[in-house]
């Protein structure tokens, strides 16, 4: 039997004989309808915002936004791709949310850093994005209510976990409220745009590590300098023709640079996971993840025994990471990610059983799984 797609074929209803001007007039008419519908949608969003404010409910609900993005991306039958539909609706959601209440989002790094890109991708252009000098500053901005939420990197698919973020999650009273994933594409940027001018290559240590083979292959004699962020590297390149910065494509426009080489990362599947932190726990969405940290006495087979409650409750562990305990040599904390929400009965039961044998346990947050 031939492999026949059941997806309906989409054909234009427009006549091939129509002039460009006639087609543009039809587009203008459609645009008028789209704008009217967007404003109708915005009015409904305002009413939802009023209802939320009257009951002190959180304006930003990541589970609901995820549900919308998944639904609308499945509605499209082309020619616009599902990814493009998601991007369009992310901006529609951002604009609608800003009518309910303005969101201030603190992020690590300067403008055009990868965390900035993740914040723009997650919250859209209608949110107020606040750059900070450090990951600790992100936590402080949220804790002191100068920002609604913060976004920080937690792990990269090639370089591993961001240890400082783990440490701050243990220290802070903030909760993980959501997560986001961003494909990382590194670019070599310079002011002059001429490869022969570059004598020094600068970037964040992780970006340099992710482009190590490319650098050796193309700039074996260049001086390599580590700086605080990829955005800071772009700032340096903007003032010195001899400096090449490994940074994001957005940095080209922000800092008036030229792209000398694009997508120079050694591994194409380079993805960074980010956490959204806030003062409250995210409500259940039906597709959630919980993160917690615990420590135990060092005994043979202890970790295996500690994970048994999750196996008995049929809870899927998605990540386990160990981290040394400060001032206690050879003692460790264990960070767990698993599917489920802390409000679920089976999850509560597993956590209670785990806690019986722990020296320390802290639930870091339950939140919708990222797209």
What are the residue ranges of the model-derived segments?
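Domain-level signature for soluble enzymes in the chorismate/prephenate branch of the shikimate pathway
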Residues: 1-371
């Amino acid at each position: 039997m031939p492999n026949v797609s059941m997806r309906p074929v989409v054909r234009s209803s427009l006549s091939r004989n129509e002039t460009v001007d006639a087609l543009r007039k039809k587009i203008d008419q459609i645009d008028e309808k789209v704008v009217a519908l967007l404003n109708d949608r915005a009015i409904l969003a305002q009413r939802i915002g009023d209802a939320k404010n009257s009951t002190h409910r959180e304006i930003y609900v990541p589970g609901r936004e995820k549900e919308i993005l998944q639904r609308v991306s499945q509605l499209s039958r082309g020619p616009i791709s599902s990814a493009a539909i998601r991007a369009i609706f992310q901006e529609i959601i951002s604009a609608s949310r800003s009518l309910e209440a303005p969101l201030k989002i603190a992020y690590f790094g300067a403008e055009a850093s990868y965390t900035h890109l993740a914040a723009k991708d997650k919250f859209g252009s209608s949110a107020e994005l606040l750059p900070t000098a450090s990951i600790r500053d992100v936590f402080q901005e949220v804790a002191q209510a100068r920002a609604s939420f913060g976004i920080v990197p937690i792990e990269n698919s090639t370089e591993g976990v961001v240890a400082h973020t783990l440490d701050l999650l243990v220290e802070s009273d903030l909760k993980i409220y959501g997560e986001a994933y961003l494909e990382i594409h590194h670019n070599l940027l310079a002011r002059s745009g001429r490869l022969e001018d570059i004598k020094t290559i600068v970037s964040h240590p992780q970006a340099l590590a992710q482009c190590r083979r490319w650098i050796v292959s193309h700039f074996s004699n260049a001086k390599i300098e580590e700086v605080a962020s990829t955005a800071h590297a772009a700032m340096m390149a903007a003032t010195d023709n001899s400096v090449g910065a490994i940074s994001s494509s957005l940095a080209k426009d922000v800092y008036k640079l030229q792209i000398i080489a694009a997508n120079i990362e050694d591994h194409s599947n380079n993805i960074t996971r980010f956490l959204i932190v806030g003062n409250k726990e995210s409500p259940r969405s039906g597709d959630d993840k919980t993160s917690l940290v615990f420590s135990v006495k060092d005994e043979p087979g202890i970790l295996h025994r500690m994970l048994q409650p999750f196996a008995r409750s049929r809870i899927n562990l998605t990540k386990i990471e160990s981290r040394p305990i400060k001032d206690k040599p050879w003692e460790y904390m264990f960070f767990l990610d698993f599917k489920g929400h802390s409000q679920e009965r089976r999850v509560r039961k597993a956590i209670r059983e785990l806690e019986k044998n722990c020296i320390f346990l802290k639930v870091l947050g339950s939140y919708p799984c990222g797209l």
